Amino acid sequence: MVRKTAPNGPLKTNLGSSFENPNSLKNLDPCANLRNVLIDNGVTIEVLNGLEEKVQKQIDEAFKIARNGLPPKPTFTAKRPLDIQKPEHIFENNQKDLTMLEAMRESLRHQLSISHDTILLGQDIEDPKGDVFGLTRTLSSNFPKRVRNSALAENTILGVSTGLALAGKKPIAFMQFSDFLPVAYNHLLSEIGAMYWRSNGQWNAPVTVMAIAGGYRPGLGPYHAQTLESICAHIPGIDVFMPSTAEDAAGLLNAISESNSPSLFLFPKSLINDRSRMTNSDISNHYVPIGKAKVSRVGQDLTIVSWGSPMPLCEKAGEVFYEAGINIEVIDLRTIFPWDIDCVLNSVNKTKKLVVVHEDNQTCGMGAEIIAQITELTDSSIITKRITRPDTYIPYDYSAQIEVLPSFKKIMEACSKMLNAEISWEKEDINQSGLLNVKAIGSSPSDETVNITELFVSEGDIVKDGQLLASVEADKSSMEISSPASGKIEE
């Protein structure tokens, strides 16, 4: 750290420093201190003088080249060109035994095993915790020097990772939640993302940043439920991803590892343990090309584009419309930036109708960007619609959270209107059978199991509304469950 000894601007005043004698800080010059440390550790003054002369000559030569050279030409992309990518490959078999969380863990394990340059850095990622959601569990035990806990400082995590990348390592930096990315946004925008462009391709900072994102889980609220992919995609030099299946998560992580490009990998907390979206254990051979979308359902009547948590809702809508004789094409974008314009454009040229669904808030979201570019590129008139989170924050109350986020109902109603189709809803009568199921949910977004520690009622008991039924213990907390209505306990 270099302490401030003068004002930032050209004014000759000491107003920029609170020290009475700024000259007293000159002995804190890190270059001078490093020179002294090297001398104390046996490096001769002659060697240091020779090194300084060599560096000075390099600076002088660079200055001459810059002064005498032609004016620089503008460049219109900040990204490092992608190397030739392999075709998409997911070995198909009927043995789907890994969730998204498990598949990502095995991809990280594979990367650690094949490259000693791979280093994982983040808050609480070492065992026994192995990340808030257990993503890195067992990895620090298997690779103790290369899976390391960090300080509780996102900017420090990315700063250290940038240095490691510039030194030839392959750092993977973990943000506990995507909501904390803004703390380190300047480092993403001005350092990691800009490094290749600033150095005219001489330097590159291939840092992979991983962050769990999104809502659709209890115990969240405004600090742990955002996705923020639009502000991340606004960074010119970073690739941004958000998968919705275990196979795509592993395939993209493997592709990112081979790309040698700065990458931000967002993964949806609502799907990390979804057993309907699992993959097989051949993780090392999973590969999903960067920038390639996936058509998860083929159709010709309307196009739905989405990514992350809303994807299962979009696919369910496609199934329901199919039963009514309407064929919806559903596209999983997978890569947010650079996104697959050709795939979406080809679909919209066929269907003439485009719906984009995302849980990020609406204004300046990716939905607006996708619709704008497709509208500019298509030769025909199209109808478009966005289904997003309104420009508001995500509430703590779970039912209110679900109302704010894109839902199956919102998707069905928007598509029906575009297709001039009628839709009606039947409200389930929970009192029709006389039974009311009491559901237990965790109080934390990382809770996956809820165990009953003490049951206060028995079968046949008569209970009142609000009466205590049980004490339960989730992964991160203990709580009590009360009866939502008066009645008789049945098993």
Across the structure, where does each feature detected by a protein language model lie?
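Terminal amphipathic helices with adjacent charged low-complexity linkers/tails
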Residues: 57-91
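Acidic, low-complexity mobile loops and tails
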Residues: 426-471, 480, 486
